Amino acid sequence: LPPDASPITLTGYHVEGSITDQVAELSYRIVFRNPGDRRLEGVLLVPLPADAALSGFSMIIAGKETKGELLEASQASSIYQSIVSRAIDPGLLELVGERMFRAKVFPIEPRGEVVATLKMTQTLSKSGGLVTLSVPMRSARFAQGEGGRTSARISLKTSRALRTILSSNSEVRIAREGEHGATISYEEGSTGHQDLALTFS
């Protein structure tokens, strides 16, 4: 490929927020870059868990605020399957049935960056006394490339004493803060992205 045909790269995907009992309020900061010598266009695709409501979105490009659209599960399904069929990420098959947020990213100027911010509110599911949070990190995708770093920092507060808190992801660090709280942090490089899964009671 010619030097100016470099794909868009995801240089940062960062999640911050808080959980109070069963309600999570999360903010996603997504940074992507055009490393080439010509304008490029991309598409931001972010899966939305069934228990999540999009409460805010901001992306300023060339001084103008860009809007996105919420796709219901039936619409999002064909996009997930299309990505899988091109062997970009077979793991996305597990997301079929979930909604998706989509936004066009244009223009991304040569050597330039664009920052998108999404805010979500989730009422977390509870089963057998266990509350579960799933943060879509691995599955965030740009139609023209991926890479960069991912990180998360989430504070947890509960009305009752926190008995158990664990994650299936070995990269997640959990720091207990008294009987009713904890801080969850996670940071990963450009390979092997995983979603953040957390269970507590």
Predicted regions and their residues:
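Subset of Sec-pathway N-terminal targeting signals
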Residues: 1-201
